[in-house]
Amino acid sequence: MALAATAGCLGLSWLIWLAGGLLTLLTTGRWQEVPVVQAPVLLVRLIAHPNVPLEAWPPLIRRSLPGPGATGAWLVVLTALGGVAISWLAWHRSDVRRSRGVPGLRRGPGGTSSRSAGARRFRLSVRLDRGVASGSVSKARGWAHPRDLRPLRVSKAPGDRIVLGTHAGRLLAAEPRHSVMVVGPTQSGKTSGLAIPAILEWSGPLLATSVKADLLHATLEWRRSLGEVQYYDPTGSVGPVAGGSRASGWSPLARAATWPGARRIASALCSVARAGDGGMEDAGFWYANAEKLLAPLLFAAATTGASMADVVRWLDEEETNEVLLALELAGVPEALRAARASLGREERQRASIYATAETVVAGFADPAVSASAESCEIDPAALVGGSAGSLFCCAPAREQERLAPVFTAIVREVLDAAFERAAATGRPLDPPLLVVLDEAASVAPLADLDRVVATAAGHGVQLVTVWQDLAQVESRYGGRWATVVNNHRAKLVCSGIADPVTLQHVSGLLGEEERAEHSWTVGDDGRHSRTEAVTVRALAPPGWLRQLPPGEAVLVYGSFPPARIALRPFFDDRELASRAASGSDR
């Protein structure tokens, strides 16, 4: 009796699983991602929530289903129809076997399938879980099953790993300090579904750049409950901030009081141009010479108490006397020689170098930015010194190009401080530093991002970069763009991308799959026949990738099979929404 009851429950749970799959197929055109082994779990959840049948399914599928009432009605109808269909097939099969006395499958001569006149044909396409590795066809295992992603599963956000989303109702997190790349157009959930949750769940120090005020406003109070929070917003783009906090000042002159420091900060300011030249040697020449000119100017200003406004004036007016006098008083021959080499160039060449240097410090020509450089409260060494402090850099969208050298220099300083501390202690930062570079191609484009991504983990830096599409990466880094992409261990591709470069590249990464095409023929005399053919096609064609439903993403992670996952908008998660709302409950 108990065995019969168990079998009945299993049969009912399987019918409910089948009905859910048919319903998602009807509403989205795709089969559900819930494994059949979880069918009993669906039955238990339905019993626990009889009035809210949607709660039985994971969020990824729940969003694709109709309302609770419609879902319940459809489940009842489809479950009943499934039961009737299975009963009819079982009866029909037993009836045919009784009448023929032979198995239902019949093969013709040579192993080919036979088909009688007036026969009915049914076709089914089934994906095979074996790869293809012949010719130019890449080996592919198809979409990941839950068991394939077991090493990435976590029961809750760890605090030192980036939660990527959910798969089959389970959280997936990147391995510790493995770099994450997020690609998607505006409104695809990059910020709300990954960047903000990552910041709210991180327990160590943080550096975040963004053009969106909501990233700061949603995380500021919670991060303040963990440690000191600073934000750099020289143009006041984020508006009033909770708690009446004021923006912190930053000046490159704070690091230019020594000649090595001046050379370093000049290199950081000019690096954004090197990142954007796409490998053009001519542009590299002019920016290298602009860096050589800027270093002694910054050193002269820092050692005489001058300001960045003075540096801008020296460049605009091609001032030489003040600069040379300051450098002579500083008593560093190398700095004086560098200045004289730049100032003594042929007139047309010198004019071009000055013009290039002017574009690098153009942001400080803005009175608001210049005023914010009168003080320097941002201390990169303190940020990576073991606390859970936070530094937000907020760039207005309309000023990205002009302010990019400033933001890049700040990010470069923090990364240098992190790498130096790791080298001094002989071990990675503990706790690790989270660096979130939103709009990584334009706000703070690091010239050596490919190397930073490759080495950050070993120094205790968790890197998250956010992009509109891969065309941005290609435009910014030229021939190195594929290396930038490949050095990220985790790559998340969000919905709505229309860029051909992104679609083709990701489709190629996912590879191809084998599909078995089955055809069944049922003759008038009750005889059955079957044929099978194997076809190879792209696992995720570009058109399919473009039509990913909102809130979903494709995860490409190391050597794991690719997976379709659901993002976690912070406002849909109770714990994250609570942290974003108050930041008071730890």
Residues covered by each model-derived region:
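Conserved ATP-driven motor cores of ASCE-family P-loop NTPases powering translocation/secretion/packaging/pilus
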Residues: 453-557
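P-loop NTPase motor domains
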Residues: 11-15, 19-20, 24, 171, ...
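Short alpha-helix boundary/capping motifs
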Residues: 46-48, 52, 385, 484, ...
